[in-house]
Swiss-Prot record:
One of its GO terms (biological process) is regulation of DNA-templated transcription. Phosphorylated and dephosphorylated by UhpB. Coiled coil: none annotated. The gene is uhpA. Pfam families: GerE, Response_reg. One of its GO terms (molecular function) is DNA binding. Part of the UhpABC signaling cascade that controls the expression of the hexose phosphate transporter UhpT. Activates the transcription of the uhpT gene. Acts by binding specifically to the uhpT promoter region. This is Transcriptional regulatory protein UhpA.
Length: 196
């Protein structure tokens, strides 16, 4: 029997996953948590083999939580975003699998079985994005905008310097945040200085 814990701040997501996993004869959901803090308090001693964790939670992000979970637990990260940079961040932080919240039930079940037996799991579409993203996830213009944002320039200043409209710079900024898996300009600057 593979024991599973679910960590997601949305009750309906946890309930749906618990019902789905409960249909499998060799899977048992033994714990559900609505926040990272609840999980840190409740996971030790539960004998959980696989943890399915939302990446975006209000108190502690799934990425931050990965380093604090009990050792020996295989973790699958869930996200509505599946940019190559975000997938890499999750894998580098210790995740054994990464699934989009749009994944099929079969993919979720396959991921649990795979990580429980020591493997790593990515859906084929995420694996393709990850491989393509390793080449260079940013366009030339996105890289220019990223450099200016990292220098602390305002959107209007960047637009004037690059001969773009402020709206276009905002679009490039939004694309950068998604591609790099960051949520603001400060995190973007850190990623720039870390070499992506």
């Amino acid at each position: 029997m593979i024991t599973v814990a679910l960590i997601d701040d949305h009750l309906i997501v946890r309930s749906g996953f618990a019902q789905l996993l409960g249909l499998e004869p060799d899977l048992q959901v033994v714990a559900e948590f609505g926040s990272g803090r609840e999980a840190l308090a409740g996971l030790p001693g539960r004998g959980v083999q696989v943890c399915i964790c939302d990446i975006s939670m209000p108190d502690i992000s799934g990425l931050e939580l990965l380093s604090q979970l009990p050792k020996g637990m295989a973790t699958i990260v869930l996200s509505v975003h599946d940019s190559p940079a975000l997938v890499e961040q999750a894998l580098n932080a210790g995740a054994r699998g990464f699934l989009s919240k749009r994944c099929s039930p079969d993919e979720l079940i396959a991921a649990v079985h795979t990580v429980a037996t020591g493997g790593c799991y990515l859906t084929p579409d995420i694996a393709v994005k990850l491989a393509a993203g390793r080449q260079d996830p940013l366009t030339k213009r996105e890289r220019q905008v990223a450099e200016k944002l990292a220098q602390g320039m305002a959107v209007k200043e960047i637009a004037a310097e690059l001969g773009l409209s402020p709206k276009t710079v905002h679009v490039h900024r939004a694309n950068l945040l998604e591609k790099l898996g960051v949520s603001n300009d400060v995190e973007l600057a850190h990623r720039m200085f870390d070499g992506w």
